């Protein structure tokens, strides 16, 4: 992986500039083949990806996007990494809203996004790529406890659709 990396703690590193690789990795784990125009941040440990976030469906007005997350282990999840992952949409892009859509039956993923601070908004019938129902969660910028007003300083632009 010839991408830029930042080291937020111990052996965990942020991986930037490898959007396609990270998106394919995340997509293969959550069952999404194509995110469309997107950006991604990976989290690596020992030279391999252990987690990744894909930022897609960016709408400058009203300032919203979709965050898709996959992970092999919870060990990557610390305050400094979360500050970077949420600093990108809320700090750099100036988004006012981030959405996470989770397969209805994936209880562990639903608990995870709730612990991050996403709030349940409703069920989208047959909205998952497999035809299953999807739980829709969202977080507003002022609800995000992971970043201050300045964001993280991470720069990874989402291309215009």
Predicted regions and their residues:
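Conserved beta-strand in the GNAT
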Residues: 48-57
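Short amphipathic alpha-helix that is part of the acyltransferase structural core
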Residues: 1-30
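Conserved acetyl-CoA binding element of GNAT-fold acetyltransferases
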Residues: 61-73, 101
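C-terminal "cap" of GNAT-fold acetyltransferases
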Residues: 127-159
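Conserved GNAT acetyl-CoA-binding A-motif
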Residues: 91-102
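A short helix-loop-beta-strand connector motif used in the catalytic cores of GNAT acetyltransferases and
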Residues: 31-42, 62
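Conserved catalytic-core motifs of GNAT/GCN5-like acyltransferases
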Residues: 101, 119-134
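Conserved active-site alpha-helix within GNAT-family acetyltransferase domains
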Residues: 105-122
